[in-house]
Amino acid sequence: MEYSQMIFRGLFITKLSYSLTCFIFFIYFNHSNAQNKILEEINSPVIFKGDERTAYRDPAVLFHNDRFYLFFTLVKNESGKIFSYTACSDSSDLRKWSQVKILTPRDQNLNYCSPGNLIRYDEKWVLCLQTYPRQGYNSGDKVRYGDANSRIFIMKSNDLENWSNPELLKVKGPTISEDKMGRMIDPYLIEDKDEEGKWWCFYKQNGVSMSYTYDFINWNYFGNNESGENVCVLKDENEYTMFHSPSNGIGIKRSYNLKDWNSFGSLITLGQKDWDWAKGRLTAGAVVDLRNIKGIEKYVMFFHGSGPNKETEGDFDKNSSIGIAWSSDLVNWEWPNK
């Protein structure tokens, strides 16, 4: 090979390598930059807006493969009757969401709703939820809550798209029949922080009640603690952090052993005083810890707000919306357009 040809090839390879390096850096930079702006580019704290015939409530969130999967209660006024469903939508940027998909049947005697959270168990996704029977509940009736037959269930999926039929969780133990379990709502599942394979179910009954299992079939009742509803529990180092909803706002408690709980911080009400859509009540905080996700690096909270009227005044099955906020420390919270 002539010397001039060798020089030419060397220059060509050098330029090609440089171009590839620049291209890879460009792709990485733009991806990272886009990730960094996910929270900054949300232009409204409202993710799903309710109206006079629709309510979005009780959010549950999963962050998986760079996507947010949001599950929630969808309440609809259909032909003068009020129905509750479990529904879902997903997004990569928290601004553009997929079409809402209803996962549960239209049946006032069941009203599957209030999804708590999703876990990964036995190579499947598991979603916990409740029934909320309100048979004969019509538009214009006084606000009615789920009756004494409200129970908690799980559904399973391989792909987050197709779900099994709901299965009852007999969280009071195998010897307690379904009709003796008592009214229970708002389930949440979490693996024990110290014992792998031991799973806890938190649910609203006598404050917050707790049961545990090793197989999701045989359950042991553990006890209860003073708490509001819509419990969400995170494991943070050697501690459990529980978010719960009293009559208004979102409270936080912490515990090392699930028996002794101490209040943490102040009641969280975010921008409620300035939000007509949440002036009636702000509640049901579902928090996901994304501090280790590059470009997000926050706790992200989804919640629902009802308004402008109080829920007892009618804005329970209508005019309820899902909102978003985030924090680095669970004390100071930010939201779009703050």
Task: Give, region by region, the residue ranges found by the protein language model.
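Bacterial Sec-dependent N-terminal signal peptides
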Residues: 1-35
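Carbohydrate-active catalytic/glycan-binding domains of CAZyme proteins
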Residues: 34-338
